[in-house]
């Protein structure tokens, strides 16, 4: 039996896209993006000696743009897939997820599913996940229990059920209640420069949520300055233009992630985003220096 491992971030992304949508359609559809697992992967986990026939790991989703009568907007879908490939070149489209908002007769649901799958035969989808949200879930486990996975046979038919495994993606931080590594301003070096230092949260009585919100605001301000720089940069060479588009897309993805709000691993995620933004800032400064040398 096949095993499909889910990142909890992928489930969160599905819920976020669903809640932020104003569509009143009965079904929302998502492409499942991921990779195949083998024993060399860090996230490979043996299954009590009974290895599954095939193991895959879902780490991202792409919302499928739908039109009336369950028609897929193929042009917009292709654009979303290509945009994802800009930053994740080795992605594999593994399957499709049906988020159902109404309790329907199974025969009707299967007909809708077959109609959608018929339009996606070119993607050679392997799996179908059904996610029922017509009942309000009060816990993560209840949401997990409402997901059922199946093989897709002959491109459009629902086959045998598969095993779903959900990874919590938890990050272990020592002394999480006592000490955090946070950026603090150091005006003696540079008014816009932040240095990292360990702060004792109990002694300083720093409000974590307030700090997180303030940090995100600072990051968004830095991102905005980079966007203005890239848009105003006078470059006629094609290599720069193509690279500029890639960086702008990356910045757009960062902004989207930051605007989603706090998570249980906010400090870990913020550190990653800070590092990504610093790398983008370095790239911008390199272009600026290169342009000055050409003059």
Swiss-Prot record:
Function as written in the Swiss-Prot or TrEMBL entry: Component of the COP9 signalosome (CSN) complex that acts as an regulator of the ubiquitin (Ubl) conjugation pathway by mediating the deneddylation of the cullin subunit of SCF-type E3 ubiquitin-protein ligase complexes The CSN complex is involved in the regulation of the mating pheromone response.
Subunit structure: Component of a COP9 signalosome-like (CSN) complex, composed of RRI1/CSN5, CSN9, RRI2/CSN10, PCI8/CSN11, CSN12 and CSI1. In the complex, it probably interacts directly with CSN9 and CSN12. Interacts also with RPN5.
Species whose genome carries this gene: Saccharomyces cerevisiae (strain ATCC 204508 / S288c)
GO terms for biological process, alphabetical: adaptation of signaling pathway by response to pheromone involved in conjugation with cellular fusion; cellular response to pheromone; conjugation with cellular fusion; protein deneddylation; regulation of protein neddylation
Major site of localization recorded for this protein: cytoplasm
Keywords, alphabetical: Cytoplasm, Nucleus, Signalosome
One GO cellular component, as annotated: COP9 signalosome
Keyword Cytoplasm: yes
The name this protein goes by in its record: Cop9 signalosome-interactor 1
Subcellular location: Cytoplasm; Nucleus
